[in-house]
Amino acid sequence: QDKIDTVSARPDALVLCYPVITWGKYEHTGSRLNLIGEEQGEDYRLTNLAEQVSDDTPPTFLWTTANDNAVPAQNSLLFAKALCDHGIWCELHLYPDGRHGLGLAHESERVSEWSRLCGEFLFELGY
């Protein structure tokens, strides 16, 4: 047996920034086509992450903006709801304004607080 097979690939926590994690009504179509193509088979189901949340999903920090014109905020909202439905510890920040791809958001004092809040979230988890 390979040693790598004895180590879990499950992350201890997730940090998702304006994530592309939902297919269907709120998808970013270009991302879906690039990742899995046109077919809506097993890959479609397995990569529609809000539907893959289980009791084993790691604690998750999410942030997004309400007016992201590339990835709808519903990607984060649906994932956060699924986490709550499973009793998974999560923290969600939905900022009213900000373009997609803000990164550390130095251009927006309000949104830039996400990195500090994320640090606090991870600290509370023991990291």
Set out the residue ranges of the language-model regions.
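Loop/turn elements at helix/coil->beta-strand transitions in domains of secreted/extracellular proteins
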Residues: 10-13, 57-59, 86-91
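Conserved serine/cysteine hydrolase catalytic core
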Residues: 49-57
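Primarily recognizes the serine-hydrolase "nucleophile elbow" in alpha/beta-hydrolase
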Residues: 1-31, 40, 44-45, 49
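Acidic catalytic loop of the alpha/beta-hydrolase fold
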Residues: 22-23, 67-71
